[in-house]
């Protein structure tokens, strides 16, 4: 593989790119994820590199070059993960919050992975006790803030947060210390169930979503409150920014 810059990185070099260039070409050994964090393991000679990728709000890897392709990976030779004779992958990112970074130090890579909480899609699933313990790491926060903190539990994004809290009947602005043990068990179970349903349906049909073949979502995962004017019971939904400027969607009648 070899990289090409464009879009976001047309003038700004991704961290580590200047160092990995001298070791190219490299072989893609694997592509892995933990929560919303993706990394590629690359090898060549006696060197191992890791290409980190975060999606931001709209980033995605695709076989099709989009209008906002910020980074391009060229595949030349055997060992490519790309099928159908496709020789390139494009990191398309409309809002340009996604990132690409190259790391060769295995200790730095291990530290990054250790900084992330258990993946909500882990098998076997994270147990209820550990789930509550991770959410309560910073007890002064609201439950909507804690669910989005990838160091607590990784893999829950904005639309999942809204749907999980609605199904649990929990007001997003409640303190993490206000929840009972039974509510934490429910929150853990619902988080796993809804995250799994979203994963199996290959995401949501929001306007920016495309799968790697550039196919729009098919509405298999439907929202109850996220981006809705009313909840399934007909109550008007409310939207408000959290402390990280992310919009939280909820029903003030159904969620207490």
Which residue ranges define each predicted feature?
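Short, mixed-charge, low-aromatic patches
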Residues: 85-91, 115-123, 142-150
């Amino acid at each position: 593989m070899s990289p090409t810059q464009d879009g976001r990185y047309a003038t700004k070099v991704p961290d580590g790119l200047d160092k990995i260039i001298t070791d190219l070409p490299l072989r893609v050994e694997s592509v892995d994820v933990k929560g919303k964090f993706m990394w590629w393991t690359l090898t060549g000679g006696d060197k191992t590199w890791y290409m980190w990728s975060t999606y931001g709000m709209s980033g995605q890897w695709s076989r099709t070059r989009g209008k906002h392709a910020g980074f391009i990976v060229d595949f030349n030779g055997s060992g490519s993960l790309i099928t159908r004779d496709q020789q390139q992958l494009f990191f398309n990112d409309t809002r340009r919050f996604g990132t690409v970074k190259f790391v060769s130090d295995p200790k730095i890579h291990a530290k990054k992975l250790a900084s992330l909480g258990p993946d909500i899609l882990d098998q076997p699933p994270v147990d209820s006790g550990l789930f509550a313990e991770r959410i309560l790491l910073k007890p002064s926060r609201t439950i909507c803030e804690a669910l989005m903190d990838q160091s607590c539990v990784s893999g829950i994004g904005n639309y999942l947060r809204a749907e999980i809290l609605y199904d649990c009947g929990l007001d997003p602005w409640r303190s993490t210390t206000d929840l009972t043990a039974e509510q934490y068990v429910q929150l853990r179970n619902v988080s796993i169930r809804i995250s799994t349903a979203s994963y199996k349906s290959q995401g949501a049909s929001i306007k920016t979503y495309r799968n790697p073949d550039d196919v729009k979502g098919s509405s298999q995962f439907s929202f109850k409150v996220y981006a809705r004017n009313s909840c399934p019971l007909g109550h008007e939904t409310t939207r408000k920014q959290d402390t990280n400027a992310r919009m939280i969607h909820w029903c003030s009648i159904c969620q207490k």
